[in-house]
Structure formats: structure tokens, C-alpha cells
A protein has these predicted regions:
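Short, charged beta->alpha transition segments
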Residues: 86-90, 115-122
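Tryptophan-centric aromatic hotspots in well-structured domains and transmembrane helices
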Residues: 76, 101-103, 107, 128, ...
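Active-site mouth loops of central-metabolism enzymes
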Residues: 97-115, 135-136, 164-170, 213
Length: 263
């Protein structure tokens, strides 16, 4: 009928395995489905992750998780366009503004203090008020020096968030949060390594007043639910393009509200 929806998925690995299912049959399971029933389509594709057909055709679990998320987002985009109602209103219309931050201060070989300061000045000049910066690739002492520069440049009033990208073991994380408390960060994101992150996050949260965030690297809503239930984090950061789409994003939002967690 001429309606279309746009969806996307995020992947940090080779995208060829994610494209593959569309070349050997997955499209036949999608064509003809009702886009106004996004949860039904999502479940249909997601449940293929544990089936004989996916094994026989070489559809990886990651591919199906990403595809189901992208399809769900596309369905919701189509629903919004067809109804001529923006999704924020379809989802309840609780707010019409959202806070934003800029992710910056990435590591790069040869990047010196002068370049870091210039980067921050440019971001401030175009109006940014909240800054998320990267740590975890250097020693605590070296990262603390970078954070001193960053805090001095942005000032005491602007928000500073710290993203470790799962770069620390628990011992280093405990040292890091103690050292970084003086920078008054809004949160520290994914501070510990992946293999025992929920247990480590719970231990770490008892060692600091800085809110801990996580969830971005989970691959299902159930992993996020476990983080909430185990009281491992104070802020849930899930990525609808990594898994779940908007359908499961709404579920996680409700779960956070019921458990008094921020998103």
C-alpha cells in the first residue's frame, strides 16, 4: 500500500553473517507478515535462534537477534507514519524532550593534551552541556590526568560521564571509582570485564557512591532483567538496535520504573 518503515541494527562484528539469512530463505518468513503486529513478528524471528532450520541454513544467533531488532524498529516506524502520530506519543507521550550527551575524548595514537582540549572546546562552542568520555585503555593514573584536563575544560557545572567499555578487572575498578569520585561523574558505564560482570558490578556498587550503568552489551532483555534483579546497576543502558527493538525497549523501561532504576 506504499507504506514503508526504516529499521536498523548495530553490530560490532562482520556484517556478512547478518546479511546471509536474507539470501537463503529468511525473507520468505517475513514477507506477508502484518507490520502492525510488531511483537508477533519479533517473536517469530527471535525464536528461530534455537531451531533446526537456523542450524541447517547457517543463520547465526547474533544475526537473528540483530535482524529481529531491526524489523521491530521498522514496524514501529511504519506504524507511526501510517497513523501520522509520532512514536513518542504512541508510547504514551510522557515527555516531548529528552536529555542528550556527546561521547568524546576517544583514545588515538598521537593524540596529545592540546588536541584533547581543542576537541572539548569545539564541542562546548556548539552548545554541548553533557560529555561522556572514554577511559580504561590506560592506567588509572594516566586516565585520571586526562579526566583532570576534561573537567577543567568543561567546568564544574556540566555533566561528565565516564565509559570504561568493560576495560577493568574488579580490583582495578575499585581503585578507579575511588580515584575518579573527585571528578563528580554522573555515572560510570560498564566498568568491569564481561565474564563475571553482574557479580563484579554488585560488589563494586557497594564500594562507591557513583551510579554504575550497564546493559548495552547484553544480547537479550533477560540479561538486562538479571542485572536489575541482582541489583548490579543503578542505571540501565540498553540498545534497541542491538536486541529487542522498541517492543522490548518498552518492556525494559517499565521494568526499570517498577524497580526504581534510571535509564
Amino acid at each position: 500500500d506504499g507504506n514503508s518503515g526504516f529499521g536498523l541494527a548495530t553490530s560490532y562484528t562482520d556484517i556478512k553473517p547478518i546479511i546471509k539469512p536474507f539470501s537463503n530463505g529468511l525473507q520468505d518468513l517475513i514477507i506477508g507478515e502484518d507490520p502492525f503486529c510488531p511483537e508477533k513478528l519479533y517473536e517469530k524471528i527471535f525464536k528461530l535462534t534455537d531451531t533446526r532450520i537456523s542450524n541447517e541454513k547457517g543463520w547465526s544467533k547474533e544475526a537473528l537477534i540483530r535482524i529481529s531488532a531491526a524489523l521491530d524498529i521498522a514496524c514501529w516506524d511504519l506504524i507511526g507514519k501510517a497513523s501520522k502520530i509520532p512514536l513518542y506519543k504512541l508510547f504514551g507521550g510522557y515527555r516531548n524532550k529528552i536529555p542528550v550527551y556527546v561521547t568524546c575524548a576517544y583514545y588515538r595514537d598521537g593524540k596529545d593534551e592540546k588536541e584533547l582540549k581543542e576537541e572539548l572546546k569545539k564541542l562546548i562552542n556548539i552548545g554541548h552541556q553533557s560529555f561522556k568520555v572514554k577511559v580504561g585503555g590506560l592506567s588509572i593514573k594516566e586516565d585520571a590526568k586526562r579526566l583532570e584536563i576534561i573537567r577543567d575544560e568543561i567546568g564544574a557545572e556540566k555533566e561528565l560521564m565516564i565509559d570504561v567499555n568493560r576495560g577493568w578487572d574488579l580490583k582495578t575498578a575499585i581503585e578507579g571509582v575511588k580515584e575518579f569520585e573527585r571528578f563528580n561523574p554522573t555515572w560510570i558505564e560498564e566498568p568491569v570485564r564481561w565474564e563475571d560482570d553482574r557479580r563484579s558490578l554488585k560488589v563494586l556498587s557497594k564500594k562507591t557512591q557513583i551510579p554504575l550503568s550497564g546493559g548495552e552489551s547484553e544480547i537479550t532483555i533477560f540479561g538486562c532483567r538479571s542485572m536489575i534483579e541482582e541489583e548490579a546497576i543503578q542505571i540501565l543502558q540498553f540498545d534497541c538496535t542491538m536486541f529487542g527493538g522498541f517492543t522490548n525497549g518498552k518492556k525494559l523501561s517499565a521494568l526499570c520504573e517498577l524497580n526504581h532504576l534510571d535509564i
